[in-house]
Amino acid sequence: MRMAMSCGGRLVQRLDFSSSEEEDGLSNRINEAPQKGSPVSSWRTNNCPFPITPQRNERGLSPTQELSPSSDYSPDPSDKGVGGECPGTPLHYSTWKKLKLCDTPYTPKSLLYKTLPSPGSRVHCRGQRLLRFVAGTGAETEDPTLVNVNPFTPQSYRQTHFQPNGKRKERPEDDCSSDSQMKFTDKEHPAVFQSKRFVLRETNMESRYKTEFLEIEKIGAGEFGSVFKCVKRLDGCFYVIKRSKKPLAGSTDEQLALREVYAHAVLGHHPHVVRYYSAWAEDDHMIIQNEYCNGGSLQDLIMENNKKGQFVPEQELKEILLQVSMGLKYIHGSGLVHMDIKPSNIFICRKQTEVGEDESDGEDDVASASVLYKIGDLGHVTSILNPQVEEGDSRFLANEILQEDYRQLPKADIFALGLTIALAAGAAPLPCNEDGWHHIRKGNLPHIPQPLTPAFLALLKLLVHPDPATRPPATSLAKNSVLRRCVGKAAELQKQLNVEKFKTAMLERELQAAKLAQDECLDLPPVSGFSCRGRKRLVGAKNARSLSFTCGGY
C-alpha cells in the first residue's frame, strides 16, 4: 500500500506499508533520498540530523485535525525555527518511529492488533446468554444481604449454622467482581440477614416454566391457583406445577403463597408428604414444582366410589389412617401443624408393579403395600410455638380453633383426619354450618353406611372427641394396635422367617464342622494297625433274629 503525504501542494515523501514488514519498511524509507526542492532536501542541507515536524497544535487544533489531509491548515511560511532554518523542533528517532500519522489507513496487521482486547478490559457478549441474571430493585442491588428468612426454621438450627465461625475463605484477586459481594463482614453474616420486601418482583427473565417444562394437561384448580401435569424437558419425568391465579407481589396473599414454600423447604423429604422440588416467581406469580402422584387425590377416589355405589373397605381405611398419621407425626415432630387436612389434600401414589398371570393370586392388582398416601397442599401450615393460624375448610375445622384456643394445635389435624376417614368410608358430605356442624363438634360421627368393626369405629369416635386432650396424638396413632393388625401378619411372618434363617445358619455351621472333623480324621496315619473304619461296630451283628410270618385267611 503506497501513500503520498503532501505539504503545501508538493510531494514530500512516499510511504510504502506491508503487512509483514511494517516497521522495517518505515525505518528504511526514512533514510531514502528525497526529491530535489522538497522540504526534506532543505532539512538535510541545513544539517538537521532527523526529520523535523512543525510545531503541533499551535492553533488549538484537535489531535484528529493535525496534519490531516482533509484539514485546510497549512504551515505558515513565517514560522521558523532557530535561525529560520528548521521549522519546528527535532524528534528523537524512537519517537518518530512511534509517530502515528493522522487519518492514515491501518495496515492489516495493525487492524488485527486493535481488535484484540486489552488484558484489563472486559469483553461484553453480544449474543444471547445461556444464563441470564437479572438484578432486582435498586434497594436489593445496593444491599446484597437481603434474603428471605424462613419462619419455620428451628431457632436452634439458626443459632448453630448461621453464626460465623471466624474462618474466612479468601478468593483469588482475579475472580469476578460479583464474587466479592459474597464476602461479608461480622456485621453482615447471615444471622442478621433481613427479609426481602418484594420477593416476587425480582425475576423478570424468560419464562422458566415454558423453557424447562412441557405442559401435558390441567389436573386441578383451587384457591391458590391452577395445577398442571408437566414433563421436565431435561430428565423426562412427570411433575406437578402449581401456578397462582393472580399476581401476588405486594398483596395480602403473598405471605400465604410463601408459607407453603417455607414449609416444604423445612420438612424436606418424607414418604408420606408430597415431595417439594423447587419454587420461583414469574410476572409476580408464584410457581411451585412438586411431586406428581399418579393416583390422584383421596377426594377423586371418594367421588369415583360414589358414582359406582361402592365404599373404601375397612382394611384400606385403616391403611389410609395409618399412613396419614405417620405423615402427621413427621410434620408435628418438626414443630409444624398442617391445619387443612381433608380428602382433597391427601394424594395417592401407586407403584407400577407388573404381575404375571401365573403369579396373580386373585386379589386386587394393587395391594396396600404398593400404595402410598401422602399429605400435600401446605398453604395453611403454621408453627406450633408461634402460631399464625389461617383457618382452612370450615367443614373440617375443630371447635377450639374457632374459639381461638391454640394450646393444642396438633389435635386439630387429628380431628380433621377423623372426619376425612369417615367420608372415605361412605359418609355424606359434611355440613358447613348450622346444627349439623355443631352436632359433629359434640363428638358425633356422621352416619357411615358400611359396617365397621367396633374397635375401629371407637377409634374414629375418639379422633373427633370434643376435648382435644382426649384425642390421641399422631405418634400414638402410628402405633395403634387396631391399625397395626393389617400389617401384624406380615410382621409375624417376617419374624418367623428370621427364626428359620437363624436355624438354617446354625445347621450349616454344624455341617461344616462335621465335614472338617471327618477330613482331619482321614488325614491321620493309622495307629497299631487299626484304621478309623475299624472302630465302627454293628450292634446285634451276631445275635439271632426272630422272624414272624403272617398269612391272611389262615
Swiss-Prot record:
It is found in: Nucleus. Its main location: nucleus. GO terms for biological process: meiotic cell cycle; mitotic cell cycle; regulation of meiosis I. This is Wee1-like protein kinase 2-B. Its EC number is 2.7.10.2. One of its GO terms (cellular component) is nucleus. Mg(2+) binds at N345, D377. Gene3D superfamilies: Phosphorylase Kinase, domain 1, Transferase(Phosphotransferase) domain 1.
